[in-house]
Every structure is written in structure tokens, then in C-alpha cells.
Design a protein with these regions (language model features):
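Portal/gating segments that form or line small-molecule/metal binding sites
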Residues: 2-122
Length: 122
């Protein structure tokens, strides 16, 4: 979904068995090197610049729960003060003031709540 003022980017990952995490909850297979084919690299500065460009994150409840486990393990909250919308019908604990929960139509969420407020929605 795109408007002249905002863009929604969907980023999904899954292993061949259809799950992101291992049975023990680890997602270490997602960790990759910062160098790629043809000698291209990602510098820490490039990554930081990219992450600062994201105005709002939208995630499912399982991804959110994984992020909370990282916090509990001492890794910190990966999203800083950037607003996070968690798609869920369950009662979950908010990790930060910037976290809100949503259960409803995604088109309504994007068009009525996110696009008026944010330009780069992930």
C-alpha cells in the first residue's frame, strides 16, 4: 500500500519448515555476515541510517514475544522509541509506552491510523 506521503514495506522471513524460530525459540539462523556477493558490504553506519528511517514497526504477537525474550535475556529493546503496533487479539504486556496492540482490519489500521502519522512503515 502506498500513498504519496507514506509507504508500507512488508518484511517476512521463514525457514523451509514454515517457522522462523527453532524449537527452542532461537533465531540464530537469521544472523548473517555484513558482506555479500560481489564484495558489497553493510557498514554499521549504513544500518543505523536505515533503521532511523523507519517511523513505525508493525509485527505479529509471536515476533513481539520473541523481542520481549531478547529484553529478558539482557539484549535490550531493539526498536528504541520508535512506535510499534502489535497485531494480536491476546492480552500482552507492553514493553514500552510506544507499543500499542491492534486487533482488527489491516487496511483500516494502515489507512486510518498509520498512514496519516508515519511515512516509512515496516
Amino acid at each position: 500500500m502506498t500513498t504519496p506521503d507514506s509507504r508500507v514495506t512488508i518484511h517476512m522471513a521463514a525457514s523451509l519448515d514454515g517457522f522462523i524460530a527453532r524449537k527452542d525459540g532461537r533465531v540464530d539462523w537469521l544472523e548473517t555476515a555484513d558482506s555479500f556477493a560481489d564484495g558489497k558490504t553493510l557498514t554499521p553506519e549504513a544500518i543505523a541510517t536505515f533503521l532511523r528511517s523507519i517511523d513505525c514497526y508493525v509485527m505479529g504477537s509471536r515476533t513481539y514475544e520473541t523481542a520481549l525474550r531478547f529484553v529478558d535475556q539482557g539484549h535490550g529493546w531493539a526498536y528504541g522509541d520508535t512506535p510499534v503496533v502489535v497485531l494480536t487479539s491476546r492480552q500482552l504486556r507492553p514493553a514500552r509506552d510506544a507499543v500499542e496492540f491492534y486487533a482488527g482490519d489491516l487496511v483500516t489500521l494502515v489507512r486510518e491510523r498509520l498512514q496519516p502519522r508515519f511515512r516509512n512503515i515496516w
